[in-house]
């Protein structure tokens, strides 16, 4: 089928111009429903193979709206491990259990009935043995009842309480959860993930509870017929089935569902943070120094030109244990003067604070130089990769990391696609989540960002090209190989000469690949080749030509289309109105980059310490991470401050992402500073 970016961009008429995020949600739901259909059929077949599928059960399975409902219906027919109930069945006690469970009006005395099932050879030596076995069978029937499970699940969700307690009193990051209770329905995702981690590390004991007075009466009403001879016996079996089998099973399910919901929320949060990180505005065309701080191995430096090409590298040792500060300053000054360096990108890892202080001090003598702290997460992973050794042969692993840090400032998207998105580290508990699901979600975000920006067909790396709609790692490498062997591409149609890139792949990828050097200006726009005729017809109708596109002479294009009528113009061009609007946008700004419309990266020239902060100070910072309970903001003191969700705005919001994104430049007011614990509390709403 078609790829999500292609559908989102070039098939707007068919889906009402939904964005890629909404289309991915639809795809997810479609996959769930397909899996549900598949599971329904599997369950029906499995029950039919046992000869137990009747019309009523078949209809119930067909009507099940969730996988959990299907599994509840299948539960009584599943192959089970050896249980007390299966042992009782082996002793021939199932007919007795069925008779007692029916609680017929004219039923004989239960002990008299049980006496008929004595069988010392099978271990049924007394009436008590027979009744105990029958009770075990009834308890399991209750635990396997789809309706009982549905009712209890609903009750636990509505009235259950999750509690955690300390296994040991030693201090830990889980102290908040040493004596914790919260209604199941009110559990926050970050609480669930923290408690799970504490339990896995042996620091917390966790349980879910619900009052017997809430849970048992509905089950008793469901299974016990008051006034019948076997009523008390069945009631006792219901209570046993509830406490021994049904509740522990539902407790596990509820906790699994809480975890699944928390994982899904955290994955969405990670994706939400990753998107603006990838879409940070590039700082193009400036000579940049990448500075990878360190201690024992020194601080690695790499100078790259405006296109990211490496000009020089060095290692300095201003930090412990060497403390060669003056020699480091001399080397930095020499590089700045020699290459006219304008920006310095400092990695935010080990020794970053000392490095920032050194750079801020040094550039007081160089008024045109600015620095910025760059998220270096994943840079070391990239620098040790096969890709890095191919791109930067002859450079030490540590120096490659400095090159990557410089390029991350120049073009964050082009550089970050070389790293596994999971390694970029802008999420909560990312290592505790289902890794396949996390990878799928994050790859989707990277794909959407890359296609939103597009890629230069003649300069893009295989890593960047592999995220373009329709392309794979193999076709991306084939494009680069073709480029190396035949020189640059001059037309989009040349893509069809690339091995393993046929018409179908061309249709998916062509609109997202730009060729600034092409003789056809449309090849450097987001206009798809299938719409070139429509674009040319539009220009003709409005009294323009392709030459006007090159000279940016289409300032009145929108107004002329409005005069002609958008719907009528679209019809004359043979496209829908949404496609016409996109063509107009592209013709007015050929080669446009959506990232250029965002606030520019905040470059600094001086540094502050946490001790310099005072409550009431108003500062400008950059949002580094958005989480469920707030956002962390870099205010230039080497310790990100926390803006709690209650301090973001005066109006009610469910999640900080409704207002903030990673990379946003915000004004904040300092509320509180704890130097010892290195905690800074900030407010956005009080800074206004």
State what each model feature region is:
Residues 10-13, 101, 211, 293, ...:
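Short, ordered loop/turn segments at secondary-structure junctions
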Residues 9, 28, 34-52, 62, ...:
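Long, highly charged, low-complexity intrinsically disordered interaction regions
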Residues 515-519, 523-688:
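Single-stranded RNA-binding regions, centering on S1/OB-family and related RNA-binding modules
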């Amino acid at each position: 089928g078609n790829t999500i970016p292609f559908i989102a961009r070039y098939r707007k008429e068919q889906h009402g111009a939904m964005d890629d995020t909404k289309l991915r949600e639809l795809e997810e739901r479609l996959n769930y429903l397909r899996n549900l259909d598949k599971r329904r059929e599997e369950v029906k077949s499995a029950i039919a193979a046992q000869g137990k599928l009747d019309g009523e059960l078949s209809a119930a399975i067909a009507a099940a709206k969730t996988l959990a409902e299907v599994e509840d219906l299948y539960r009584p027919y599943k192959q089970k491990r050896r249980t007390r109930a299966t042992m009782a069945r082996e002793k021939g006690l199932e007919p007795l259990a069925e008779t007692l469970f029916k609680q017929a009006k004219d039923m004989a005395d239960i002990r008299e009935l049980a006496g008929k099932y004595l069988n010392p050879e099978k271990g049924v030596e007394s009436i008590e043995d027979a009744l105990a076995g029958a009770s075990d069978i009834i308890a399991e029937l209750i635990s396997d009842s789809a309706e009982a499970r549905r009712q209890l699940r609903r009750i636990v969700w509505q009235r259950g309480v999750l509690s955690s307690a300390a296994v040991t009193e030693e201090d830990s990051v889980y102290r908040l959860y040493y004596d914790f209770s919260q209604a199941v329905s009110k559990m926050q995702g970050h609480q669930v993930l923290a408690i799970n981690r504490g339990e896995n590390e042996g620091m917390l004991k966790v349980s879910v509870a619900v009052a017997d007075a809430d849970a048992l009466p509905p089950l008793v009403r469901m299974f016990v017929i008051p006034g019948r001879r076997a009523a008390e016996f069945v009631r006792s079996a219901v209570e046993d089935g509830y406490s021994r089998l049904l509740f522990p099973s539902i407790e596990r399910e509820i906790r699994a569902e809480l975890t699944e919901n928390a994982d899904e929320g955290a994955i969405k949060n990670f994706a939400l943070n990753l998107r603006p990180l990838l879409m940070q505005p590039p700082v193009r065309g400036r000579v940049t120094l990448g500075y990878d701080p360190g201690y024992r191995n020194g601080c690695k430096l790499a100078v790259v030109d405006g296109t990211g090409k490496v000009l020089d590298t060095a290692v300095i040792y201003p930090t412990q244990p060497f403390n060669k500060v003056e020699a480091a300053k001399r080397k930095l000054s020499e590089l700045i003067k020699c290459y006219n360096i304008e920006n310095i990108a400092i990695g935010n890892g080990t020794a970053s604070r000392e490095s920032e202080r050194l750079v801020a001090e040094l550039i007081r003598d160089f008024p045109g130089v600015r620095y910025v702290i760059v998220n270096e997460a994943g840079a070391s992973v990239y620098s040790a990769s096969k890709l890095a050794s191919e791109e930067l042969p002859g450079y030490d692993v540590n120096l490659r990391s400095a090159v990557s840090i410089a390029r991350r400032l120049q073009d964050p998207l082009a550089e970050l696609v070389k790293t596994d998105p999971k390694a970029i580290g802008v999420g909560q508990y990312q290592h505790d989540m289902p890794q396949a699901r996390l990878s799928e979600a994050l790859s989707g975000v990277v794909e959407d960002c890359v296609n939103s920006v597009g890629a230069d067909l003649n300069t893009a790396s295989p890593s960047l090209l592999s995220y373009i709609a329709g392309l794979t790692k193999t076709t991306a490498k084939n494009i680069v190989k073709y480029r190396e062997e035949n020189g640059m591409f001059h037309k989009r149609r040349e893509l069809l000469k690339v091995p393993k890139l046929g018409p179908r792949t061309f249709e998916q990828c062509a609109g997202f690949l730009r060729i600034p050097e092409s003789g056809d200006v449309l090849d450097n726009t987001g206009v798809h080749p299938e719409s070139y005729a429509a674009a040319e017809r539009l220009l003709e109708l409005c009294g323009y030509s392709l030459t006007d596109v090159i000279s940016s002479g289409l300032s009145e294009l929108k107004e002329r289309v409005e005069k002609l009528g958008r719907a009528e113009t679209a019809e004359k061009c043979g496209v829908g109105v949404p496609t016409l609007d996109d063509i107009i946008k592209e013709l007015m700004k050929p080669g446009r980059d959506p990232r250029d419309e965002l606030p520019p990266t905040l470059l600094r020239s001086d540094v502050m310490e946490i001790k310099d902060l005072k409550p009431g100070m108003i500062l400008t910072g950059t949002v580094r991470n958005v989480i469920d309970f707030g956002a962390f903001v870099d205010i230039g003191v080497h310790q990100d401050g926390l803006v709690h969700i209650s301090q973001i705005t005066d109006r009610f919001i469910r999640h900080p992402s409704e207002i903030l994104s990673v990379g946003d430049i915000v004004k904040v007011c300092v509320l509180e500073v704890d130097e010892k614990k290195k905690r800074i509390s900030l407010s956005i709403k009080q800074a206004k």
